[in-house]
Amino acid sequence: TLRKGRVLDVSDIIGVIRYLIDLSYGVGQVDDIDHLGNRRVRRCGELLQNQFRVSLARMERVIRERMTIQDINSLTPQVLINTRPIVGVIDEFFGSSQLSQFMDQVNPLSELTHKRRLSALGPGGLRRERAGYEVRDVHPTHFGRICPIETPEGPNAGLIASLAVCARLDDFGFLTTPFKALNEGKADDAVNYFDALQEEKFVVSPYDSLIVKGKVPKEEQVPCKAFVGGEQEFTYKTVNSIDLVQVSPLQMISVAASLIPFLEHDDANRALMGTNMQRQAVPLLNTEPPIVGTGVEYHAARDSGTVLVSRYPGKVTYVDAEKIRIRRDPEYCPVQDLPPERFTQAVGYTLVEDVSGRSGSTLLSKDTVLDSATIERLLDLHDEAIKVRKIREDEYELSKYSRSNQCTCVNQKPIVRMGDEVEAQETIADGPATNNGELALGRNILTAFMPFLGYNFEDAIVISERLVKDDIFTSIHINAFEIEARDTKPGPEEITRDIQNGGDDIVGKK
């Protein structure tokens, strides 16, 4: 039997009609289709699962047909099952789906932004021709969940967006954002995530209202977002009325927008253009960190995956252009009990604790590295298991001059030296467009805002010859070209520059 409430019955139909009649008299509220409580994110795993389910249904139909046609006694799984529908659907999903895209790999920021992109287009979504202003517009529920700045210009404006810095998806695909509760005008240390519907029950204030630091008098009016008269509004209330406060001033914008210093003083349209243009910067040959930053540069570079980070704390034992070796701290090497019959296998292992002889005196002290001589002494004078650990050395390989999806150069350079002590998750090698583990997309050059004989009219700029001579803005681009040599009827094709009846000047020979 179906559980109660799983199917429509007469009472449901009556309830629907009653609500519609009430709405015609102005009683009740209509659901807002653009409210993030009514919109959920379908992740790539869910999209693939739907395609896989379709292919399994096709395969089931083929199996049933074969079972009815062929003799049951002679059937084998190989005869019945044809995996071609599954392979075809998965290939089609990754190869030609509207939501399966070639990763934007111009620089680390473009890669990170592409992975955090949200799209209202695609199968089961909107069509850009049919999408009106309402669905493209910024909604109050986007606050802290979807960036109001970062979106493309043109026909996709508002349909393709970017996750805000602190936004997170819950188990059901709804976007959540973190808040701290306010008690007597002071913010708690505990951080809780709320979706758009949960947030409506509270009065929320942004981080930069300074409530978090407890510096605002309780009677003072502060900016906040509240649910008033059936819709969310940005208004002012006293500190006593505030229930929740944001955890960061960057919470409402995306990673790319948070890299712009003094963003609050920018015009929104220009901020949008600046955010999008950062993703088009090619990695330079000589990088330089920005003089004025926002503090997000380090996190953006590390989270993009282009820099190399150490997995465990330890000491650097070897560095060259292609690899780095780090000896782990002993605490991060697994301890094992070694019985006497396996003592001979312990060459190179380190003792975790002192080992006593049969007489009770200390035979070997802690941190002794075992060799064949010490193992002989152990076999003669010790009969119990010992605790040892193998000090491990991790090797990190660097990517050298490889080609990205957009033909930019991916080259990692070590930034540690032999003997350096490193912590876990510390940057040990720079990638493209990074400097000492920080994102470095451009150069700090002296700029003059002045007319120059009309050469810089409109968007034109005049640059110094030194920028070219000193490789200030030089970048490396790697292109791959393929050519096929086929077997033809007259004979196999040959790739050569010795052209018959052609002079040396044709092929550039001197």
Language model feature labels by segment:
Residues 162, 297, 321, 329, ...:
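Short, surface-exposed secondary-structure boundary micro-motifs
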Residues 312-332, 448-488:
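Carboxylate/His-rich catalytic cores and anion/metal-binding grooves
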Residues 154, 323-324, 371, 422-437:
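Short hydrophobic beta/alpha edge segments that flank linear recognition/processing sites
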Residues 397-423, 510:
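Short histidine-centered loop motifs in beta-beta connectors
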Residues 314, 370, 416-428, 449:
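A structural signal for short beta-strand/turn segments enriched in small hydrophobics and glycine
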Residues 121, 128-130, 135, 399-401, ...:
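P-loop NTPase nucleotide-binding/switch module
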Residues 142-143, 303, 415:
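Short, small/polar residue-rich loop motifs at catalytic or cofactor-binding pockets
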Residues 1-138, 147-160, 170, 176-316, ...:
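Extended, domain-scale alpha-helical bundle/helix-rich regions
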